[in-house]
Amino acid sequence: MRNIFKRNQEPIVAPATTTATMPLAPAAPADNSTESTGTGESQEDMFAKLKDKFFNEINKIPLPPWALIAMAVVAGLLLLTCCFCICKKCCCKKKKNKKEKGKGMKNAMNMKDMKGGQDDDDAETGLTEGEGEGEEEKEPENLGKLQFSLDYDFQANQLTVGVLQAAELPALDMGGTSDPYVKVFLLPDKKKKYETKVHRKTLNPAFNETFTFKVPYQELGGKTLVMAIYDFDRFSKHDIIGEVKVPMNTVDLGQPIEEWRDLQGGEKEEPEKLGDICTSLRYVPTAGKLTVCILEAKNLKKMDVGGLSDPYVKIHLMQNGKRLKKKKTTVKKKTLNPYFNESFSFEIPFEQIQKVQVVVTVLDYDKLGKNEAIGKIFVGSNATGTELRHWSDMLANPRRPIAQWHSLKPEEEVDALLGKNK
């Protein structure tokens, strides 16, 4: 480009060289100034040519302008994403190094503690390792206390247990109170259990109830008296508040005893599995007719020596604790899974249906001795759990049989509930 430009400027320089008298020195500045101007113009021309060439090449691409813009935006986003990933990776490395450094310091401190050394923080606060552990230990929970009495009649071989009162019980209900009652039994035999009445909404109940156990004095030393306080809940399992255990071999029964003892945390009782029974209920309001169908039972408790039972079912219609009518099924021999499918009807006017209970008891038939109860349930408006739901479903679906499985409960437990509902 510079050669072309010089060639174009030759006519200007030529006249100066033709004059013999003109000195050659002044011509140099003119040539330099002209040369610098030419260089500036050539750079602008080059940029313009490159620009035109670039746009010409773009125009040759068979894509609309918006597509090219979109491609440029995508390329920019990819570039930004790459930059972000690189920055994040660098930051993560720094954090990881700090974390490893801190972990190493922590391990070093732990090793120091194991060697019996004190770290700087403990030294500043004046705390020793033993003092720190003492602060972490929780204080024993206060579960309240129970007052009871013991009296043994040597002539009658009879132990009388008095459940007098409890105090400072913890609140287990939403209202800040509890509904306590006491279960009394002698270990290792859990079959014979007594229960006090439920005292509503109190943390300091006065029971003042007595219970007797027929036990020879020679056998009494191997037994443990348990008095467990529970919080009654109508719609769920009763929660244990605490218990008092009295090993009878540690008590001098030569004279009556009366004392207070602190309640200890009690273990949740594993309920004895007695089996399940399936019943169907049907009520026709217009006819005032209740039909109870005993369908079947399963997994019944073994009552006979051979590991089986001879089960049958009794049905009692009750009102206010009184038995109005009773029915019973046939006996099924040597089985723990009997199938009955027997129906029984009771005449109950609609205005009385909410005042009655149907008590279902599964018994083991014994030809020689007394028939023993395996388990029991009752349904009615004052029942709880699945029994109450079964009764409610029956009333909500008149003329329609409603079947439901129920877990059998100990006879004493059901009788206690029926007694409270009088």
Curated annotation (Swiss-Prot):
Residues 1-60 are vesicular. Predominantly expressed in brain regions such as the spinal cord, brain stem and cerebellum. Ca(2+) 4 binds at D304, D310, D364, D366. Ca(2+) 3 binds at D233, S236, K237, D239. Residues 88-422 are cytoplasmic. Residues 31-41 have a biased composition (Polar residues). The modification Phosphotyrosine is found at Y230. Its main location: membrane. SMART domains: C2. It is a single-pass membrane protein. Changing F47A: No binding of fragment 1-61 to BoNT/B heavy chain. Glycans are attached at N32. Residues 16-30 have a biased composition (Low complexity). One of its GO terms (biological process) is regulation of calcium ion-dependent exocytosis. It comes from the Eukaryota. Keywords: Calcium, Cytoplasm, Cytoplasmic vesicle, Differentiation, Glycoprotein, Membrane, Metal-binding, Phosphoprotein, Repeat, Synapse, Transmembrane, Transmembrane helix. The first C2 domain mediates Ca(2+)-dependent phospholipid binding. The second C2 domain mediates interaction with Stonin 2. The second C2 domain mediates phospholipid and inositol polyphosphate binding in a calcium-independent manner. Exhibits calcium-dependent phospholipid and inositol polyphosphate binding properties. May have a regulatory role in the membrane interactions during trafficking of synaptic vesicles at the active zone of the synapse. Plays a role in dendrite formation by melanocytes. Homotetramer. Heterodimer; heterodimerizes with SYT1 in presence of calcium. Interacts with SCAMP5. Interacts with STON2. Interacts with PRRT2. This is Synaptotagmin-2. It comes from Rattus norvegicus (Rat).
